[in-house]
Amino acid sequence: MSTITSYFGFLLAASTITPALLIGLSKIRLI
């Protein structure tokens, strides 16, 4: 049960961090 919870937590973190990184990279490229 703990492994499933940590797995979904990892997916949630990845789904929130990845777009933020992409936006940051796009802003850096625009500058």
UniProtKB/Swiss-Prot annotation:
It is a single-pass membrane protein. It comes from the Eukaryota. One of its GO terms (cellular component) is cytochrome b6f complex. The chain crosses the membrane at residues 4-26. GO terms for biological process: photosynthesis. Component of the cytochrome b6-f complex, which mediates electron transfer between photosystem II (PSII) and photosystem I (PSI), cyclic electron flow around PSI, and state transitions. PetL is important for photoautotrophic growth as well as for electron transfer efficiency and stability of the cytochrome b6-f complex. Belongs to the PetL family. This is Cytochrome b6-f complex subunit 6. The gene is petL.
